[in-house]
Amino acid sequence: MFEVVIGLEVHTQLNTKTKIFCSCATSFGEAPNTNVCPTCLALPGALPVLNEEAVKKAIAFGKAVNATINKKSVFNRKNYFYPDLPKAYQISQFDIPIVEKGELFINVKGENKRIGITRAHLEEDAGKNIHENNFSKVDLNRAGTPLLEIVSEPELRSSDEAVAYLKKLHSIIRFLDISDANMQEGSFRCDANVSIRPKGDTKLYTRVEIKNLNSFRFIQKAIEYEVKRQSEAWEDGTYEQEVVQETRLFDTTNLVTRSMRGKEEAAEYRYFPDPDLLPVLLKDEFLDIKIPELPDEKKARFIDELGIKESDAEVLISSLEMSRFFESLISQNLNPKLCVNWLNTELMGLLKGELTIENSPVDAQKLGILIKRIEDGTISAKAAKDVLAFVFENTSVEIDEAIEKLGLKQVSDDSAIEAVIEQILNANADKVAEYKSGKEKLFGFFVGQTMKEGKGAFNPAKVNEILKTKLG
């Protein structure tokens, strides 16, 4: 039996307005090679100037994971040649990163586990190679975009743990609002270092790096395939030939990893301090940066202060947008548990395909009005589902307008309900007698008959109240 050893390197693009060493915009989707200048094109004489906001965002992350923030950190040149790297070196951090020795906690199958974070350092992103037919093109818009590279300790022992770690990290980054962490656009990318060893062995064997994984599903599949490949090679006696230190890519069509190139050692990058950038010396006020409420803290508050079930609280903190939507709901002085039900179950049940809570046709204000109409007895909970479905499809229609159009306004007028109840009790005198002689289950019969006569428009609470009075 083998033990799996996984360490993850996550590159997240920081959401600064400009690049890390120049004033070019970082906006995504612009025409190729338009967000560039002499600095990010590496023209002679152009010098880098560090973006202060990128430093602040790195510090915020460090505080969120209980890390050490180094008051002095150094930028280095990482030397390698690739078409999308104009300078033929990347400005990164090596021996003195801005953040080190952090931690986060994951829960897998009901068990909590601490995962160490070795370091988080600032660096610049490369450009992008685009391969079309017989040509390769280079777009340098992305070159110089600020990255925070977050390196975990090799303490993850399964693909499930790796995905749990990444989801937790992704959530923290989003709640800090230091990156949009959009995996499809490449602003949250993961490299996985995977190796195996016999159970009980403490030696670290040959690790394989799987590059640029950009979905949780593919990360899980890539790790599972690589573990299977290495395990089979060990059992077949071909481990030393088949498993070499290399970089592999994940084939998302066939769900296999394929060799890309040999993996370089740090010495091959010839790191040395960048002579164009002074060491970063942090003043004390930089270390006092306030960070927002994090997912675990928010979850605890929802449970302790609002009385929400843990499983519901997990859904509410599953994304920054979800928690913001919920907090916008309860800010309207609504019952928190009612809000949870209508958000987690009813609205989320309608969001399919490209629709998410972020672009939901029904916003928090509109859903809040619907919940208010349930609370004040204007409509029943059952009718409210029809109203929600209607405004979901007809986005220009307001809640009160939809209630009128659908004819779902609840009747709470005592005299109208009383008249129908009198009629039902008179028509069922024998059942009234049975009820009064102890057959209390008949109460439901009277309620059902009343609601039927009222075509579902009667306020159920009022019906119950009046029936109890009439039946004694």
Curated annotation (Swiss-Prot):
Question: What are the protein's GO molecular function terms?
Answer: asparaginyl-tRNA synthase (glutamine-hydrolyzing) activity; ATP binding; glutaminyl-tRNA synthase (glutamine-hydrolyzing) activity
| Keywords associated with the record | ATP-binding, Ligase, Nucleotide-binding, Protein biosynthesis
Q: Which PROSITE patterns match?
A: GATB
Q: Which cysteines are joined by disulfide bonds?
A: none
Q: Which domain of life is it from?
A: Bacteria
Per its UniProt record, what Pfam families does this chain match? GatB_N (PF02934), GatB_Yqey (PF02637)
* Catalysis: reaction(s): L-glutamyl-tRNA(Gln) + L-glutamine + ATP + H2O = L-glutaminyl-tRNA(Gln) + L-glutamate + ADP + phosphate + H(+); L-aspartyl-tRNA(Asn) + L-glutamine + ATP + H2O = L-asparaginyl-tRNA(Asn) + L-glutamate + ADP + phosphate + 2 H(+)
Q: How does it assemble?
A: Heterotrimer of A, B and C subunits.
Q: What does this protein do?
A: Allows the formation of correctly charged Asn-tRNA(Asn) or Gln-tRNA(Gln) through the transamidation of misacylated Asp-tRNA(Asn) or Glu-tRNA(Gln) in organisms which lack either or both of asparaginyl-tRNA or glutaminyl-tRNA synthetases. The reaction takes place in the presence of glutamine and ATP through an activated phospho-Asp-tRNA(Asn) or phospho-Glu-tRNA(Gln).
**Matching PANTHER family, A to Z?**
GLUTAMYL-TRNA GLN AMIDOTRANSFERASE SUBUNIT B MITOCHONDRIAL AND PROKARYOTIC PET112-RELATED, GLUTAMYL-TRNA(GLN) AMIDOTRANSFERASE SUBUNIT B, MITOCHONDRIAL
Protein name stated in the entry: Aspartyl/glutamyl-tRNA(Asn/Gln) amidotransferase subunit B
EC top class named in words: ligase
Q: Which organism is it from?
A: Campylobacter jejuni (strain RM1221)
Mention one GO biological process in which this protein takes part, according to its record: glutaminyl-tRNAGln biosynthesis via transamidation
List its EC numbers: 6.3.5.-
Q: Which Gene3D superfamilies match?
A: 1.10.10.410, GatB domain, N-terminal subdomain
